[in-house]
């Protein structure tokens, strides 16, 4: 045994992992990709895309403590989708098309089979979003992490014509708020969820509470975050929307006000979309207030679009073409003096 392996770092396992993920990476290749996995840096040729005034838009994020659920369940092949979704949906919210993605995995012990499952999910998320997986890093850090632990983060870069970029100045009073449903909890609020389920209550991930209609708690919590690129990017390129809010950490209360200026107020009609059973369950056993829920969770909505009255029918028609479910949940109005930027009533 070499001295580095004695210290807890198995370089051979790293080589094994690279060989396992090569076909996964190759399956995400798209126009503009240069080189292949194994170089010191990933390369992408923007000229091939034919933009007139290109602006690059970057985003980075992780999966948070949802990873602890995946590790407890020994199910590691979906959290990579979450990682990509958290990044590319943010890039989309600026009006950009995701181009390429890089991942970072830190672990206590490099188990090539397990980490290849993680990258399998990353590659799937890249395919769903049209991103090329052009690089990544796996850092084996004994003593920093327990052998069964890993962390996952990602970095997305997208592109937009300068004139297509979305900013808060575009939204206007009278804009309709069109919401696209989430698939579940997505990747935020898991510290509160874990406290409610495992500290305040003795819930098992294998439990099947009546509210979840036959699904286990673990299965429900691990449902991957939705990726909205296919449904929404055409709306951006047709200049049909004024803003996109990705409902992530901080829920509605924090994220929706980011897409309009301080002189506007979002009035949300609670009950204008069907709730998801997982949120009813968490609210009940966690004894959570509405404020707790809307400050923490997506409450069944993953993305909100601000759309002018002139374009709302065209947006709905395009979403129907993509077989995308949507709900009209409210409007932007002039903000009364001294009032909050968002009201849920």
Swiss-Prot record:
Matching Pfam families? AIRS, AIRS_C
By its UniProt entry, which Gene3D superfamilies does this protein fall under? PurM-like C-terminal domain, PurM-like, N-terminal domain
GO CC term, one of those recorded: cytosol
EC code? 6.3.3.1
Q: What is its main location?
A: cytoplasm
Catalytic activity annotated for this protein? 2-formamido-N(1)-(5-O-phospho-beta-D-ribosyl)acetamidine + ATP = 5-amino-1-(5-phospho-beta-D-ribosyl)imidazole + ADP + phosphate + H(+)
Q: Which GO terms describe its biological process?
A: 'de novo' IMP biosynthetic process; adenine biosynthetic process
Q: Which InterPro entries match?
A: PurM-like_C_dom, PurM-like_C_sf, PurM-like_N, PurM-like_N_sf, PurM_cligase
Entries under HAMAP family matching the protein: AIRS
Task: Quote the protein name from its UniProt record.
Answer: Phosphoribosylformylglycinamidine cyclo-ligase
Q: Which gene encodes it?
A: purM
């Amino acid at each position: 045994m070499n001295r580095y392996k004695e210290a807890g770092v198995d370089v051979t396992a790293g080589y094994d992992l690279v060989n396992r993920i090569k076909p996964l990476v190759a399956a995400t290749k798209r126009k503009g990709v240069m080189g292949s996995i194994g170089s010191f840096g990933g390369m992408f040729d923007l000229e091939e895309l034919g933009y007139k005034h290109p602006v690059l838009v970057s985003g980075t994020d992780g999966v948070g403590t949802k990873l602890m659920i995946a590790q407890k369940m020994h199910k590691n092949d979906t959290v990579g989708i979450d990682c990509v979704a958290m990044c590319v949906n943010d890039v989309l919210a600026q009006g950009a098309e995701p181009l390429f993605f890089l991942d970072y995995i830190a672990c206590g012990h490099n188990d090539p089979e397990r980490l290849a499952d993680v990258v399998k999910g990353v590659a799937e998320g890249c395919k769903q979003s049209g991103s090329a997986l052009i690089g990544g890093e796996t850092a084996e850090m004994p003593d920093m992490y327990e052998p069964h632990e890993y962390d996952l983060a990602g970095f997305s870069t997208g592109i937009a014509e300068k004139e297509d970029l979305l900013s808060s100045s575009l939204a206007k009073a009278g804009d309709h708020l069109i919401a696209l449903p989430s698939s579940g909890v997505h990747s935020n609020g898991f510290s509160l969820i874990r406290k409610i389920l495992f500290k305040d209550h003795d819930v098992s991930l294998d439990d099947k509470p009546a509210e979840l209609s036959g699904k286990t708690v673990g299965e429900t919590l691990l449902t991957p975050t939705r990726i909205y690129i296919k449904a929404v990017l055409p709306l951006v390129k047709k200049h049909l929307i004024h803003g996109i809010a990705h409902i992530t950490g901080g829920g509605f209360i924090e994220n929706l006000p980011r897409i309009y200026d301080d002189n506007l107020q979002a009035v949300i009609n609670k009950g204008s979309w069907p709730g998801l059973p997982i949120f009813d369950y968490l609210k009940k056993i966690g004894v959570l207030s509405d404020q707790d829920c809307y400050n923490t969770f997506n409450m069944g909505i993953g993305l909100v679009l601000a759309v002018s009255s002139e374009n709302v029918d065209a947006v709905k028609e395009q979403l129907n073409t993509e077989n995308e479910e949507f709900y009209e949940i409210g409007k932007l109005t002039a903000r009364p003096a001294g009032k909050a930027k968002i009201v849920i009533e």
